[in-house]
């Protein structure tokens, strides 16, 4: 089966593993998925991220994070810009997810950034996803 949107697939796998309270998730690697996983780690939404290199494309192992009572750290993930409808925002129009409680992940000329980092660097770009 041909996958038309690997980023949406990655976010859906994280959402499903999170709902099922799995500790670890493995997905096929790509540069943009690695970047998204690193942002989730840096922002505290996941415990750790490992990149496993093999002879093919590699695997990203994501260690999901839960609170002390088992509550989910990631409430939801939403794909914004899709292959059929790209969404671009200027620096002054960058969205705030839940008034700053969540993050927007953007693909910019500076690489993958959160909405806060993009504001600091004064760049806009394609809004990949919202995480809260």
Swiss-Prot record:
One example of the protein's molecular function in GO is:
structural constituent of ribosome
Query: Which controlled-vocabulary keywords does the entry list?
Result: Ribonucleoprotein, Ribosomal protein, RNA-binding, rRNA-binding
| Listed InterPro entries | Ribosomal_uS8, Ribosomal_uS8_CS, Ribosomal_uS8_sf
One GO CC annotation, please?
ribosome
Q: Which GO terms describe its biological process?
A: translation
Gene3D superfamilies hit by this protein: 3.30.1370.30, 3.30.1490.10
Domain of life, per UniProt, equals Bacteria
Q: Which residues form a coiled coil?
A: none
Q: How does it assemble?
A: Part of the 30S ribosomal subunit. Contacts proteins S5 and S12.
Entry-linked NCBIfam families: PRK00136.1
What family does the database annotate?
Belongs to the universal ribosomal protein uS8 family.
Fetch the HAMAP family from UniProt: Ribosomal_uS8_B (MF_01302_B)
What this protein is reported to do is described as:
One of the primary rRNA binding proteins, it binds directly to 16S rRNA central domain where it helps coordinate assembly of the platform of the 30S subunit.
Q: What is this protein called?
A: Small ribosomal subunit protein uS8
Gene it is expressed from = rpsH
């Amino acid at each position: 089966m041909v996958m038309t949107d690997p980023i949406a697939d990655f976010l859906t796998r994280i959402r499903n593993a999170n709902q099922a309270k799995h500790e670890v998730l493995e997905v096929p690697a790509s540069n943009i998925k690695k970047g998204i996983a690193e942002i989730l780690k840096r922002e505290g939404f996941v415990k750790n991220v490992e990149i496993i290199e093999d002879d093919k494309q590699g695997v990203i192992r994501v260690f999901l994070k839960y609170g002390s009572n088992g509550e989910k750290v990631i409430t939801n993930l939403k794909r914004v810009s899709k292959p059929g409808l790209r969404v671009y925002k200027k620096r002054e129009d960058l969205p705030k997810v839940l008034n700053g409680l969540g993050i927007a992940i953007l693909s910019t000329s500076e690489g993958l950034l959160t909405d806060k980092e993009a504001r600091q660097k004064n760049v806009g770009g394609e809004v990949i996803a919202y995480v809260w």
